[in-house]
Amino acid sequence: KTMKNEHLENLVVGEEHWTKKGDVDLFMWNKFLPSDEVKNGTILFVHGSSMASQPTFDLEVKGRPFSSAMNYFAALGYDTWCVDMEGYGRSSKHRDITCDIANGADDLAAATAYIKQYSGCTGIHLYGISSGALRAAVFTEQYPERLGRLALDAFVWTGEGSPTLIERRKKLPEFSKSKRRPINYAFVQSIFNRDHPDCVEPKVIDAFAQAICSLDDSMPNGTYIDMCSRLPVVDPEKITVPTIILRGQYDGIASVTDLLKFFEKTNESSIIKTKILDALGGKKYWWSKLRSFVYEEKHVFHHCRSGGAVLGGWFFNRSSYPTVG
């Protein structure tokens, strides 16, 4: 199905930014429509354990419009940002550390401070996927005043019922012996066969793998070590901003049981709503569905039966937004 504002993707502008965290240089990427139209807000996207930010959130796939989450939300009037965590992509890799979840939360502190100073925005919306969701949640506990809304995709709390983490823990001694682990094209392909095959178009996997491997041939071990041995790292009672949790049917890291227990411990004044979305027609449909998230609800759980971890997030100002079919 053709999106009604597909023509806007070609108008989206990208700009490179850099900020400091001590002696660490953090690469940031900003995409937006260069117009005077009303902006719906600012979104910062947070990547996971095995890929930098641009391959994750600004992917280009020939003949496939809006493969970039940043382009999609920029076309909707959002000011979109992503940041390479320390040890990933274009950001500094010189320190002899594992770049764990807590370190990633520090990266987000530096990134959000820069965005607020640069653009003057208030209430940055934050989207994190997998270990990026953990980084985002830890940061939210520390700096709730900087945020508008929070989206946690492929999130895990205690790790209960996670077949992926059960298998990954078998390699914990290996991960603990080194600061980084090698990755290559075949490794990236294996990510899409881990939970359930055939959930993603082959040309998307190819473009994704090539983009990741063009920036990195190894990844930090810190988030793997944390997810295998140090969960939980987030206290749900300290998440006080409006939050949506996204989970794909075949997500091998985040079990429904684990996530619902997390929800049970959220703020008592929160409105909790569970939706089961069946047979979703791919990422564009999923992103547009997220726009219908009721503005007043504080915490919402979505379970998607059509795929693994879903790329995208949604933060909605109901007063004004372009139409997407």
Where are these regions (language model features)?
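Conserved acidic catalytic loop of the alpha/beta-hydrolase fold
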Residues: 105-123
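Glycine-rich "HGGG/HGxG" loop immediately N-terminal to the catalytic nucleophile
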Residues: 54-55, 81-99
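Conserved hydrolase catalytic core segment
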Residues: 122-127, 131-159
